[in-house]
């Protein structure tokens, strides 16, 4: 059974000129992992960074931090090997970006990374189901991918609930517009991993925000288990 409540800051809205220092601050503040958004300007209109930055972060931060790569790219097959060489831990690709998810899943595993599979708000969760037993994590987008600081889409929660019901041992991640006023909705629906960007990154005390999110998430998850 997927357990615990892991909080992963998204560095999308951080100062990219001081990215290493900001990531270190997040880890020192109690982050369970780092959520790194890779955008190519094709799959989504924005552009962020690629594997050279990930490789630099690994050298600066050491081997312990878990890098969850959210690959918002139109050719996810192209970047598996470079991200593996850069020592990414998990390669999360979008179901909408490939015609051969099974082949891509196999390639990611053969390159030594965990597999995440993401779906946009407009994609039915049932399309993810055939691959759920072959992946480590399902990412349910709660905003349209591509930019930070969007409003949380509560109508995505039935997707999370359906996945948790159908695949109880699967890690499920909510990503987009998640803060202290919305994290409980993700956890109550069944998410055990939460990505939060602005709520953490813009805070003068990120440790307190991370702890608050984790506590709210844990309480909501406990409530969910009692309500069964």
From Swiss-Prot:
Residue numbers binding substrate: 10, 70, 146-149, 175-177, 197-198
Enzyme class: isomerase
Transmembrane segments: none
GO molecular function, one term: D-ribulose-phosphate 3-epimerase activity
Keywords, in A-Z order: Carbohydrate metabolism, Cobalt, Iron, Isomerase, Manganese, Metal-binding, Zinc
Co-factor requirement: Fe(2+); Mn(2+); Zn(2+); Co(2+)
Active-site residues from the entry: 37 (proton acceptor), 175 (proton donor)
Functional pathway: Carbohydrate degradation
Catalytic activity of the protein: D-ribulose 5-phosphate = D-xylulose 5-phosphate
Residues given in the record as a divalent metal cation binding sites: 35, 37, 70, 175
Primary role: Catalyzes the reversible epimerization of D-ribulose 5-phosphate to D-xylulose 5-phosphate.
Other comment: According to some authors, RPEL1 is a RPE retrogene on chromosome 2 which is likely to be functional.
Protein name in UniProt: Ribulose-phosphate 3-epimerase-like protein 1
Source organism: Homo sapiens
């Amino acid at each position: 059974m997927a357990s615990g409540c892991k909080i992963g800051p998204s560095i999308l809205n951080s100062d990219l000129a001081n990215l290493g220092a900001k990531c270190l601050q997040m880890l020192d503040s109690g982050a369970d992992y780092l959520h790194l958004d890779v955008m190519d300007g094709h799959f989504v209109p924005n552009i962020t960074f690629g594997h050279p930055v990930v490789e630099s972060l690994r050298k600066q931060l050491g081997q312990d931090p878990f890098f969850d790569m959210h690959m918002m790219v139109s050719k996810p097959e192209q970047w598996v090997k470079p991200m593996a060489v850069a020592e990414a831990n998990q390669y999360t690709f979008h179901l909408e970006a490939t015609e051969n998810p099974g082949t891509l899943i196999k390639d990611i595993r053969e390159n030594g990374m965990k597999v995440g599979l993401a779906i946009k708000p407009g994609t039915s969760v049932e399309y993810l189901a055939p691959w759920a037993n072959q992946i480590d994590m399902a990412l349910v987008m709660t905003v349209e991918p591509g930019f930070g600081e969007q409003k949380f889409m509560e109508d995505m929660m039935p997707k999370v609930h359906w996945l948790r019901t159908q695949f109880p041992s699967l890690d499920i991640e909510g990503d987009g517009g998640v803060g202290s006023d919305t994290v409980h909705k993700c956890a109550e629906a069944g998410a055990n991993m939460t990505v939060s960007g602005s709520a953490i990154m813009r805070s003068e005390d990120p440790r307190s925000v991370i702890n608050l999110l984790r506590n709210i998430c844990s309480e909501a998850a406990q409530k969910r288990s009692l309500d069964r």
